[in-house]
Amino acid sequence: MKEEVSTSNQEDLVADQEVIASEESDLSPKEEKVSESTIDDDDSLNDAELQSNKQTLDNEARLEQLEKEHETLRSQYVRIAADFDNFRKRQSRDQDDLKLQLTCNTLSEILPVVDNFERARQQINPEGEEALTIHRNYQNLYKQLVDVLKKLGVAPMRVVGQSFDPTLHEALLREPSELMVEDMILEELVRGYHLNGRVLRHAQVKVSMGPGPKVDEEDKQIDEDSQADKRDEATTASNELD
């Protein structure tokens, strides 16, 4: 009886071991599959991260290249815009200079007519009512011409008694003078004109060679005494300030 029980227990133990072994055999492939799947997922994540990093680097490089191209194009645009603006200003100046030159040339042709009017006015002495009427009409015509020149910006120079300036005057004659010192203009021979501050025609003049007015000894002494008094007054005022 005891032998039968022992045999039965052994059979049960063997059966349990077989069940456990069977369960272990069933679990092992599943665990291997899970482990392999995890490794595959990790590899996929690493590949995706590497691809993302590579794409980021490519984008940054492309962005840097585009920024350089943009800066180059902007610099070219600024340079072209500046060149065009300078060209426009230069064209405007050239046009203004051309207009002024044409105006000067035209007025220079008219000025001799004005000179003839002025000479005639100085020389003609009308006698009789008819001659006086003609003279008045002639003067009115001269006045109209002068008014037109004024509207265009033409102004005559006033040179007598002024210092000679080669940028404004042309010396046709030089002679000694006791009335004016050296290089002072004695007489206007041909009138000069300005056009809006620019010399339209140089004045042709007679220039003094001196010596100028003589100073009497008495006048000279009075002048020296006056200057001495002024120096004394200045010294006194300076001392008072101190």
UniProtKB/Swiss-Prot annotation:
Residues 1-11 have a biased composition (Polar residues). Keywords: Chaperone, Cytoplasm, Stress response. Residues 1-57, 208-242 are annotated as: Disordered. The keyword Iron-sulfur does not apply. One of its GO terms (cellular component) is cytoplasm. It is found in: Cytoplasm. GO terms for biological process: protein folding. It holds the Pfam family GrpE. GO terms for molecular function: adenyl-nucleotide exchange factor activity; protein homodimerization activity; protein-folding chaperone binding; unfolded protein binding. InterPro entries: GrpE (IPR000740), GrpE_coiled_coil (IPR013805), GrpE_head (IPR009012). The keyword Cytoplasm applies. Residues 216-226 have a biased composition (Acidic residues). Participates actively in the response to hyperosmotic and heat shock by preventing the aggregation of stress-denatured proteins, in association with DnaK and GrpE. It is the nucleotide exchange factor for DnaK and may function as a thermosensor. Unfolded proteins bind initially to DnaJ; upon interaction with the DnaJ-bound protein, DnaK hydrolyzes its bound ATP, resulting in the formation of a stable complex. GrpE releases ADP from DnaK; ATP binding to DnaK triggers the release of the substrate protein, thus completing the reaction cycle. Homodimer. Belongs to the GrpE family. This is Protein GrpE. It comes from Prochlorococcus marinus (strain SARG / CCMP1375 / SS120).
